[in-house]
């Protein structure tokens, strides 16, 4: 299991699979995530489903880590275990899509704070320049 921040800190090539249903995926998902509904994935990865496993193995390389995104992090944990048993480096995103939304909101706030801090710095510089001009 990994946090959203750990996913973004991982600079390697990776695959993000959103295992929520298509409607939710279409509303919003993580950048570069592909959709693969969890029930379909579970069925494809069953031991007795040779064609499903083959399809998965041909689509997703074991050389690239797979991050799994569900609503809350529970269903993706099950799939994480299955993929690890198959030899994949797989991670469930802790807290799922809810955690992603919280992380995204926090990033917006940080960006806004940085912009405001830069505006204040620029304003202080302007004041300093005007003071210097007056007393030259």
For the regions a language model picked out, list residue spans one by one.
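Rhodanese-like catalytic fold shared by cysteine-dependent sulfurtransferases
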Residues: 1-6, 10-15, 22-65, 74-136
């Amino acid at each position: 299991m990994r946090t959203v921040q750990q996913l973004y800190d991982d600079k390697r090539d990776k695959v993000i699979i959103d295992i929520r249903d298509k409607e939710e995926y279409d509303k919003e998902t993580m950048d570069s995530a592909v959709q693969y509904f969890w029930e379909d994935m579970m069925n494809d990865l069953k031991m007795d489903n040779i064609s499903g496993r083959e399809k998965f193995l041909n689509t997703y390389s074991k050389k690239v880590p797979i991050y799994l995104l569900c609503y809350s992090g529970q269903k993706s944990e099950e799939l994480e275990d299955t993929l690890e048993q198959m030899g994949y480096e797989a991670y469930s995103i802790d807290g799922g899509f809810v955690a992603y939304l919280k992380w995204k909101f926090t990033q917006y706030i940080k960006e806004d704070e940085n912009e405001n801090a830069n505006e204040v710095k620029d304003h202080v510089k302007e004041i300093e320049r005007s003071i210097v001009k007056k007393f030259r």
